[in-house]
Amino acid sequence: MIKKFDKKDEESGIGSNPFQHLEKSAVLQEARLFNETPINPRRCLHILTKILYLLNQGEHFGTMEATEAFFAMTRLFQSNDQTLRRMCYLTIKEMANISEDVIIVTSSLTKDMTGKEDVYRGPAIRALCRITDATMLQGIERYMKQAIVDKIPSVSSSALVSSLNMTKISYDVVKRWINEAQEAASSDNIMVQYHALGLLYNLKKNDRLAVSKMLNKYTKSGVKSPFAYCMLIRIASRLLEESEEGHNSPLFDFIESCLRNKHEMVIYEAASAIIHLPNCTARELAPAVSVLQLFCSSPKPALRYAAVRTLNKVAMKHPSAVTACNLDLENLITDSNRSIATLAITTLLKTGSESSVDRLMKQISTFVSEISDEFKVVVVQAISALCQKYPRKHSVMMTFLSNMLRDDGGFEYKRAIVDCIISIIEENPDSKESGLAHMCEFIEDCEHTVLATKILHLLGKEGPKTPTPSKYIRFIFNRVVLENEAVRAAAVSALAKFGAQNESLLPSVLVLLQRCMMDSDDEVRDRATFYFNVLKQQQLALNAAYIFNGLTVSVFGMEKALHQYTLEPSEKPFDMKTVPLATVPFMDQKTDLAPMATKQPEKAVPVRQDIFQEQLAVIPEFKNLGPLFKSSEPVQLTEAETEYFVRCIKHVFPNHFVFQFDCTNTLNDQLLEKVTVQMEPSEAYEVLHYVPAPSLTYNQPGICYTLVSLPDDDPTAVSCTFSCTMKFVVRDCDPQTGVPDDEGYSDEYVLEDLELSLSDHIQKVLKPNFGASWEEVGDAYEKEETFALTTTKTLEEAVNNIIKFLGMQPCERSDKVPENKNSHVLYLSGVFRGGHDALVRSRLALADGVTMQVTVRSQDETPADVILASVG
């Protein structure tokens, strides 16, 4: 029985780690005891334990000192003490990679491996395989084959697991032991059968047909080991995911049959596999959910936990499938295990009806203070999902969340609550004032700088739009007086937004900013001075450019461009259009599966587009194309099961497109060389250059590029269809060795057509204050037209189609159409290729289809013409 130590014991050192203050040099000095005769097993055991402890704590051993200790340890093989011998095996495995000449123990290990002492044989095999390299493997091959089929289960299991590890060193040699592995797979011992099956799968996993045959054999004949059943289920589910047969396959029938197995672990594995299969319908989930429902009433806490955790996952995608379990889940709310109770309540929050929300919230409040922060975050995530499902219940949720915010808790927990309240404010305009009031109360006593700055940003964004914005000024200015530099700077920015949007508050804000100009911190002073001078001009366009919208460029890209500018001094001022735009974060794509409280990077890191910019810049043909404007999502140009897998990423530059083709050769008997994708445009686009992929070996992806110039004479030609053909030189090769023939021959493969559309020329850019941005751009290049969308039946459908077609960013949450409305205004913003801001205001009216009045404003005439021409 483990003794439980209280805090006093810890402080006095009683019961603390006996190896806590070990010094490597002292332990290595003690290791010299190994050379003494007679050998003292007890003392040697203690020293070996110390060495293993240091190694596992990450202590660095130099090669010389490790080798010296290793050689001294080899003398311990002269002792017949069983415990000492097995400790030697463990130490050999740990020191194999840091000592030199470890092969000197090969003969001792081989002797133990083939000896009569069964207790030595298994550990000796594991240690021997750890020090064996590819050149020595054939020397012990005969012993390994014998050990795999040995009657002693521990020996057979050791040989099988070691063989599995040896496949990384010499796959071809281990593959010759497949007959022995198949013999071991028919063993009566559950662990031997499991390990044998694992080795067989590892040897055959690259051959889909062989895996299917193996699965077919063992699913029909059956296995005795529950562990082996679990492995078969996992292999079957992996094959099901890769195949198109889906739930009509015999593999699915096998997994479903395992729900009736006598072993609980097999039943759970089968249920879990069914639930995680893609595109599973509620009807197909039903048997798995029924089994999990039975587990909910199990006397075993582990089974109850597994069941409710899995049902929680099901509820994220198929809440209706879990509704039948609601009664069982309600019984688990009072479970003595708080983890089970938390998962039960969060599952009920996902599946419950609107009428049950109040009751569930009361039940949560009774025990929420007793659970860990990790589970509190899970509860908050469930509440967030419930808010989206039942927006009218926001007041109940908001009250509950504000109470949780007052409780003690760590940063991740508090951030989850703040994120949840922000999402409620954004989704429910009616909740804005109460939500902002809770946020103001929280920052009065907030110890987390990140959260304080986030809330101040929210107040600056939403506060000025409320009926009485003046009430937030006091809370914001308190932060300037009481907080650290980062929070003070954020408070100054928030104050400026109030002054920019509310004329009545402007004089007061200017006075407060003047006070901030005396701050001790440079950043706070600079911000206050800058905003003070901008606000004094009282120009809406200036406010929009420098207070509301801010910079829309990539921080990493700007840092790099500025650094380059300082390295090459020029009389020309720095041009912001040379900096790549920042891509819009996919906030609306959050799912319940992704935790809300994920760690954010503390410094600017390169995003996907910045990485592409660096990769393309090193290719000589692309050096003078200018800044990378946009990179598209990958477009698949082949079917999933074809000989070659090709997908395309479209990189947009001011006057060119670079098409990046990611190609994978799925044929193991071919080596492809000089791979290019030839493109034939339907319009006036011109192909300038091909950059080939030098070679494509089996299953190793390669990249080739095609450079295309845009038509000079027609800037409105934004749409084009390219016919694509992959051309290459084929060299046949041996599938086993991968060695290609000397001679090759030319071949080609026709790909799907590739489309260019308007959305490829526009980068999404979020404008926090659309009205101010609209005035900032001005009406110099304003175009307007009215269209009839006869095939569109709802405003929601019209909004989604417009956003998708134009590829622009919705602003002011105008992508959400209020219920029971016959008219709506959609605001979109973006930047057209070349760096020109483009704004679209689309007035929609529903009557026998949808009538749409589109107004476009831009800094240049071309984007306005292009957008209207494309919509028409």
UniProtKB/Swiss-Prot annotation:
Any one GO CC term of the record: COPI vesicle coat
Intrachain disulfide bonds: none
GO molecular-function terms, A-Z: structural molecule activity
The keyword Phosphoprotein belongs to this UniProt entry's keyword annotation: no
Matching SUPFAM superfamilies: ARM repeat, Clathrin adaptor appendage domain, Subdomain of clathrin and coatomer appendage domain
Positions annotated as HEAT repeat: 64-101, 283-320, 321-355, 356-392, 395-430, 467-504
GO biological process: endoplasmic reticulum to Golgi vesicle-mediated transport; intra-Golgi vesicle-mediated transport; intracellular protein transport; organelle transport along microtubule; protein secretion
Similarity comment: Belongs to the COPG family.
Function text: The coatomer is a cytosolic protein complex that binds to dilysine motifs and reversibly associates with Golgi non-clathrin-coated vesicles, which further mediate biosynthetic protein transport from the ER, via the Golgi up to the trans Golgi network. Coatomer complex is required for budding from Golgi membranes, and is essential for the retrograde Golgi-to-ER transport of dilysine-tagged proteins.
Subunit annotation: Oligomeric complex.
Name of this chain's protein: Coatomer subunit gamma-2
